[in-house]
């Protein structure tokens, strides 16, 4: 019966030697209402007076009590020094380190002092546990937890929600699936009102780990007994119901020993419950608890075995990553260089062994930069951004020189469209920079995840990082130059014969023709009414005549781009069509710039430029022709409006063609001059820079803590293998 628990304690000690708390040993948690006899039951199991006793609330902090069985011959225990203590039983607290207590009165006093230190001296309760280990030849190997008793009404310094606090504290301990619940209920209370059984069923509804203990059998009313309760006829408990007799307060005051109490308990049971005496009492409770603990440990063994195997595999892998001491430095260096270069290229290709799941990295991020970041940035560039009407008119006038232009010069279109195309260079260079940064990040990714062997040799790691960084740094200006040339190529020749550009011009011609027809249909009625009222040809009407409503609305508008209306023919004074006919438009963009004489006359009639000079020169300052002219806001003429509109449409059409070319060619250039070049030359560059006999000893110098890490991993692996062997022995020898 006692053979299994020492093995589990030994297993726990194996992990404690390496500073790990891996296995949760099954605990026996004692719960019950206040003054139900929980501490008395624990004292009976220990066999000594070591817990504070009294009326009211006494246990105000959880007490984790570990009972350790020792042989009667093993009396001398040392504290790690030459001097030790000579005792048959002793105790040790966690908070007092290696101090040993041979007087159990001192243990009880230390529990009271430690309780008051945290919880105060006025019935306060604290969830912080007290750890006590008791060594004795009179106990079996058990771990018990004594909890504060459940109460309803706060007293002393207890908060108003003391009932809820204690309930949460109890649930925290009994919710552990590896615990056995000892539900203590007094025999002089109704079993149906047991708070201990009620809270136990909340976490253990099947009753698979709940054992009921009935205390105070000797305090029942005269003429009554607990026969029905002990036999499970009132409330059945799956693991059983055990009755015990505790010492009374008078017995404690009279210094009655636990041994005498157990002897008197046996006599009482033989007298009152002779048929149940062999299945009740403190000794039977201890044996039952030990048996339940054994079965519970047996059920936990498969999980413990699995956890140990997983940890052993992890530490074995860690030890392998640390590697063995280097024998052939030349081969080791070449192997590490080759492995790093392979992992670097695999990370770009997406075939690396260690793939990130939390974020994009490597080739996936480069793809995201090309098609998401760079693509969206180019699409956000406005083809007409930074251009206004004044800029366009100024470019047109500067391109014509001193001569008035009959058509819009092509030079102005090229000048303006080149200005817009140049705006694509900055996001293209930024794309190169982002790809360069990602390739820098791949270095760190490979160092951390893919080639952990490099962590053994920090100097080699730093040298590899430096070589790859220099290689990337050398390729950066080459790639930037190529991207700059791609933009320069587009600027070098404006291809107005581009198929997409010709199609766009033809479509715009059709749109303008449609706009002319629509405007003519709207203006003919207004022109006819004006002829009847003024009797003057509309083309020669005085400038002072008010324009029709449509023209007035036009006059109020600002200098913005819109679809300017043009007439197809000008009506004569008699209502007929004038001599000015429409010239046919051509298929290229020059056809958009032609106009008819009637259109010019109508434009002059509709809007006269606002005079810039003062009406009375005598009253103003003298005009100096050498002064720089100041731009004056005025309404554009119909021709100026049309010229601006045509130029804007042409710029937008050609800009979209160039943007499409840049969006396609820049990623290709980056891949060829930066990414693929680095992939192809990385290994040869690393070998050429680092694979030298003069650098072997320096590069393959291990870090100072690597040997310590290797030793710790080996010790942990050895401890895990020992634990696995112990579990195998338990399974083969004791359980199956």
From Swiss-Prot:
Changing residue 616 to A: Loss of activity and phosphorylation. Unable to rescue aberrant mitochondrial fission in PINK1 null mutant neurons. GO terms for cellular component: brush border; clathrin-coated pit; cytoplasm; cytosol; endoplasmic reticulum; Golgi membrane; late endosome; lysosome. InterPro entries: Dynamin, Dynamin_GTPase, Dynamin_GTPase_CS, Dynamin_N, Dynamin_stalk, G_DYNAMIN_dom, GED, GED_dom. Residues 654-668 are annotated as: Important for homodimerization. GO terms for biological process: calcium ion transport; cellular response to hypoxia; cellular response to lipid; heart contraction; intracellular distribution of mitochondria; mitochondrial fission; mitochondrial fragmentation involved in apoptotic process; mitochondrial membrane fission. Residues 32-39 are annotated as: G1 motif. Pfam families: Dynamin_M, Dynamin_N, GED. The modification N-acetylmethionine is found at residue 1. CDD domains: DLP_1. Expressed in the cerebellum and in several regions of the cerebrum and diencephalon. Strongly expressed in the cerebellar Purkinje cells and in the pontile giant neurons. Its EC number is 3.6.5.5. GTP binds at residues 32-40, 215-221, 246-249. The modification S-nitrosocysteine is found at residue 644. Residues 344-489 are annotated as: Middle domain. Residues 522-554, 566-588 are annotated as: Disordered. PANTHER family: DYNAMIN, DYNAMIN-1-LIKE PROTEIN. The GED domain folds back to interact, in cis, with the GTP-binding domain and middle domain, and interacts, in trans, with the GED domains of other DNM1L molecules, and is thus critical for activating GTPase activity and for DNM1L dimerization. Belongs to the TRAFAC class dynamin-like GTPase superfamily. Dynamin/Fzo/YdjA family. Homotetramer; dimerizes through the N-terminal GTP-middle region of one molecule binding to the GED domain of another DNM1L molecule. Oligomerizes in a GTP-dependent manner to form membrane-associated tubules with a spiral pattern. Interacts with GSK3B and MARCHF5. Interacts (via the GTPase and B domains) with UBE2I; the interaction promotes sumoylation of DNM1L, mainly in its B domain. Interacts with PPP3CA; the interaction dephosphorylates DNM1L and regulates its transition to mitochondria. Functions in mitochondrial and peroxisomal division. Mediates membrane fission through oligomerization into membrane-associated tubular structures that wrap around the scission site to constrict and sever the mitochondrial membrane through a GTP hydrolysis-dependent mechanism. The specific recruitment at scission sites is mediated by membrane receptors like MFF, MIEF1 and MIEF2 for mitochondrial membranes. This is Dynamin-1-like protein.
